[in-house]
A protein has these predicted regions:
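Conserved nucleotide-cofactor-binding alpha/beta core module
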Residues: 1-63, 74-81
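Beta-sheet entry/capping signal
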Residues: 4, 27, 50, 67-68, ...
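Residues at the C-termini of beta-strands that transition into short coil/loop
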Residues: 9, 55, 72-73, 92-95, ...
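Short, surface-exposed amphipathic charged segments that create phosphate/polyanion-binding patches used
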Residues: 20-23, 65-69, 86, 105-107
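Residue-level preference for short coil/turn positions at secondary-structure junctions
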Residues: 47, 84, 116-118
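Donor nucleotide-sugar binding/catalytic pocket of nucleotide-sugar-dependent glycosyltransferases
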Residues: 67-79, 84-99
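Conserved catalytic-core segment of nucleotide-activated headgroup transferases in glycan assembly
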Residues: 93-131
């Protein structure tokens, strides 16, 4: 859980950085990096004493205002650390999911899901707000 939630999506980059400082945020984690609609400007203004890049962009941010980048040995082998401006924090798997802990087998019939008994079903599990 969290103690406080601030909806900042309509705030300017500067106002978000100032808010983060005013609430004495300890660590800011950038989940977007150099991707569409990211807000790296907030990190450039030092929103928190410790700033981390994780999951959304797997390359170096190449900026002195990012302290750490979270990865695994597959994403960034130790021999390649020299190409990153950030210190690398290694996890066993940089993704929060892994293939070692499989979910329990749950099966549904097409009828239970309101689907026709025959035919092809297309699915997209993409975040609809990505663009």
């Amino acid at each position: 859980g969290v103690d406080h939630f601030h909806d900042v999506h309509t705030m300017s980059h500067k106002d978000v950085a100032m808010l983060a400082r005013s609430v004495e945020l300890d660590i800011a984690v950038d989940l977007g990096g150099f991707t569409q609609n990211s807000r790296t400007e907030i990190f450039a203004m030092s929103a928190a004493p410790i700033q981390i890049s994780y999951i959304g962009y797997l390359g170096t941010m190449g900026a002195n205002y990012y302290d750490y980048l979270v990865a695994d040995q597959t994403i960034i082998p130790e021999k390649n650390q020299k190409y990153y401006s950030e210190k690398i924090v290694y996890l066993p798997s940089y993704q929060v999911n892994d293939s070692k802990e499989l979910p329990p087998e749950i099966t549904f019939t097409r009828k239970e899901l309101g689907l026709p008994e025959k035919g092809v079903i297309f699915c997209c599990f993409k975040l609809s707000t990505l663009f």
